[in-house]
């Protein structure tokens, strides 16, 4: 196998893992109610044929808030309040990644 073939196979594996993470984060978010309008109970997630009914700027601000919380944890050298054995920086960065994959899953 050539280096180019090996690199391509590695890319396909990484792409597949990214797809799996995106779907897992999106499915978990739907199950957790992140894709339901709190006021109306309307389902906000879409099927492939539908136009997304989400507020993308709101979702981006939620990602930004996780990054801001990570910065605060780093600046103050804090442990996480819900996972006290982990640094707040680690947990908030993981939350930001989850929200990124969730948004990507939601907009297709």
What residues fall within each predicted segment?
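Flexible "arm" and connector segments at domain edges
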Residues: 1-108
